[in-house]
Curated annotation (Swiss-Prot):
Hormone involved in different processes, such as regulation of the pH of the duodenal content, food intake and water homeostasis. Exerts its biological effects by binding to secretin receptor (SCTR), a G-protein coupled receptor expressed in the basolateral domain of several cells. Acts as a key gastrointestinal hormone by regulating the pH of the duodenal content. Residues 1-22 form the signal peptide. Keywords: Amidation, Cleavage on pair of basic residues, Hormone, Phosphoprotein, Secreted, Signal. It is found in: Secreted. The keyword Phosphoprotein applies. This is Secretin.
Length: 133
């Protein structure tokens, strides 16, 4: 006795199932959230890369500077692990750039370069530069 032949419906179902599994999925259209994620990810990677670079540079610089400092002064000036320590050879230059400056109109300005202030007072300067009437 031979097994019964499959019905045409069963053959059609098998054909559909086998062909749909062989086809690749259609490509997904890019979404706005994909761009936001990749943008944020690349920004974080750049930030981590910059942080590693700074730690490498500062670490090397700190090691070079600590070789020249006696051991007893290291105990009190050792920075914490989480702090970023930049060692400047000229502290006066650093203070000049960090302290706020008075601009010509009397307001504080962090962007004026360091150095001695001009000998001309603000009122003298405005009188000499004022156009004639």
């Amino acid at each position: 006795m031979e097994p019964p032949l499959p019905t045409p419906m069963l053959l059609l179902l098998l054909l559909l199932l086998s062909s749909s599994a062989a086809l690749p999925a259609p490509p997904r259209t890019p979404r706005h959230s994909d761009g936001m994620f990749t943008s944020e990810l690349s920004r974080l990677q750049d930030s981590a890369r910059l942080q590693r670079l700074l730690q490498g540079l500062v670490g090397k610089r700190s090691e070079q500077d600590t070789e020249n400092i006696p051991e007893n002064s290291l105990a009190r000036s050792k920075p914490l692990e989480d702090q970023l320590c930049l060692l400047w050879s000229n502290t006066q230059t650093l203070q000049d750039w960090l302290l706020p400056r008075l601009s010509l109109d009397g307001s504080l300005s962090l962007w004026l370069p360091p150095g001695p202030r001009s000998a001309v007072d603000r009122s003298e300067w405005t009188e000499t530069t004022r156009p004639p009437r």
